Amino acid sequence: MNPVTVFFVVVVTVAACMILFQVYSIYLNYDNIKEFNAMHSPLEYSKMVNVTAIDRRIQDANDDIYDAKQKWRCVKLDDSYVSLSMFGYKSDGIGIRRFRTLNSCIDYTFSTSTHSSILNPCISPNDPKSRECTFLKSVL
C-alpha cells in the first residue's frame, strides 16, 4: 500500500470511530437528554438572549414574528373569546370573529386561519374611541 492509501484508510477509520463515540455518548445520556428536553419545553416558543427557540415542526401564525405585540393570542372579550394582535382582530368578514371556547379560538387562530380577514377598530373609518379599540389597546 502506498502512503496516500494508508492516509485515507486512517482518516476514514478515525471518522468512523468518532461517529461511533458520538452515538455511544448519546446512548449513555439518552435519559438526561429526555429530561433536559422535558424541562425546557415550556421555552419552546420563547425568545431568549441571542437564542430564538421556534418550533418548526408545526407552522402557525406566530412562527416568524418576534415582537410580542404582533403575536396572535386569544383573549376573553365579554362572554366570548377573540383572536387579536397589534394588527387588530381576526374577522369573519362582517365583524370580529367570536368563539365560545378558548380551544376553538386557539384552533382557528393557529391552524385554520392562515389567510383570514383582520379588522382593526382603531383606524378609520372605525371609531378610535370604541370599546373594541380601547380593549385592543389595553391588552397590548
Swiss-Prot record:
Chief subcellular location:
virion
Membrane topology type: Single-pass type II membrane protein
For this protein, the record's InterPro entries field holds:
Poxvirus_A28
Superkingdom is Viruses
Residues exposed to the Virion surface side: 22-140
Query: How is this chain modified after translation?
Result: Contains two intramolecular disulfide bonds. They are created by the viral disulfide bond formation pathway, a poxvirus-specific pathway that operates on the cytoplasmic side of the MV membranes.
The UniProt similarity line reads: Belongs to the poxviridae A28 protein family.
Query: Mind listing the UniProt keywords for this protein, alphabetically?
Result: Disulfide bond, Fusion of virus membrane with host membrane, Late protein, Membrane, Signal-anchor, Transmembrane, Transmembrane helix, Viral envelope protein, Viral penetration into host cytoplasm, Virion, Virus entry into host cell
**Function field:** Envelope protein required for virus entry into host cell and for cell-cell fusion (syncytium formation).
Could you state one GO cellular component term attached to this entry? membrane
The protein, known as: Envelope protein A28 homolog
Please verify whether the record's keywords include Cell inner membrane: no
Pfam families membership: Pox_A28
